[in-house]
Swiss-Prot record:
Source organism (scientific name): Herpetosiphon aurantiacus (strain ATCC 23779 / DSM 785 / 114-95)
GO CC, one annotated term: cytosol
A Pfam family per the record: Pantoate_ligase
UniProt binding sites for ATP: 26-33, 143-146, 172, 180-183
Record-linked HAMAP family: PanC
Keyword Cell cycle included in the entry's annotation: no
Catalysed reactions, as listed in the record: (R)-pantoate + beta-alanine + ATP = (R)-pantothenate + AMP + diphosphate + H(+)
Gene coding for it: panC
Keywords associated with the record: ATP-binding, Cytoplasm, Ligase, Nucleotide-binding, Pantothenate biosynthesis
Enzyme class: ligase
Entry protein name: Pantothenate synthetase
């Protein structure tokens, strides 16, 4: 496994391969990331991963400085997963002095996470565009856990005619249903025990829908009641939305509705979703 830091090194290595799969990460890897790397390797023959904690997608009072980092562990996990090349650029490599170009996606960035994290998706869209430009992947792999992010990425890839296939893989969960996330490491034992309430709220919604409930507001209320049973859970939002436009629904009259939520447990903000 090669480990490189510069754009030039990535481009030089990329020339030897016809097809590559790409998994962009912010490091502190878990089984969800590694499953993407394994899928990338299986489908393309070559897997490239990046590790870059992207400062432009963090707000001024968010956790950029404290975001968990463990490079030696990450590299060992990537090698074991069959990764061929790891790109670990510096902030200066991605955003050199004088950098002043950003990718702004309208519409789908407005609700949900976008409404609560101003500038977040501008940072995501800009860095992913630059990573794609450098790596030139055949396919790029993302997890369904960051549902709005997947919609945003698919939007700009389509709008800007980027020659990459975006593959969305199912959320990988702990045994108790908690979606795997690097930020789960912030939770203490009591908070970790409370965190599966997000998945319980999602499964309550799914069960109600399967039983014939199509009133979106009734399902939102059911989710809020489920979350209210956990004293440590502070609800940011619950959403039942169209999976493409991300606009809230009043009636569920279609397959593939996106049910999502954001909840604070202590100081840690967790997100999760399912498509029903």
């Amino acid at each position: 496994m090669q480990v490189v830091t510069t754009i030039e090194e990535v481009r030089a290595a990329r020339r030897q391969w016809a097809e590559v799969g790409f998994v962009p990460t912010m490091g502190f890897l878990h089984a969800g990331h590694l499953s993407l790397v394994q899928q990338s390797k299986a489908e393309n023959g070559v897997a490239i991963a990046s590790i870059f904690v992207n400062p432009t997608q963090f707000g001024p009072n968010e956790d950029f400085a404290s975001y968990p980092r463990d490079t030696p562990r990450d590299l060992a996990l990537l090698e074991a997963a069959g990764c061929d090349l790891v790109w670990m650029p510096s902030v200066e490599e991605i955003y050199p002095a004088g950098f002043s170009s950003y990718v702004e996606v309208e519409g789908v960035t407005a609700p949900l996470e976008g409404a609560r994290r101003p500038g977040h998706f501008r940072g995501v869209a800009t860095v992913v565009t630059k990573l794609f430009n450098v790596v030139q992947p055949t396919k790029a792999y993302f997890g369904q856990k960051d549902a709005q992010q997947t919609v945003v990425i698919r939007q700009f890839v389509r709008d800007l005619a980027m020659p990459v296939e975006v593959v969305i893989a199912p959320t990988i969960r702990e045994a108790d249903g908690l979606a795997m996330s690097s930020r789960n490491s912030y939770l203490n034992a009591e908070q970790r025990a409370a965190a599966p309430v997000l998945y319980r709220a999602l499964t309550a919604a799914q069960t109600a829908y399967a039983a014939g409930q199509t009133d979106a507001e009734a399902i939102r209320q059911l989710m809020l009641e489920t979350l209210a049973q956990e004293p440590l859970a502070q609800v940011d939002y619950v959403s039942i939305a169209d999976p493409r436009s991300l606009q809230e629904l009043t009636t569920i009259d279609q397959q593939g509705v996106l049910v999502s939520l954001a909840v604070r447990i202590g100081k840690t903000r967790l997100i999760d979703n399912l498509v029903m």
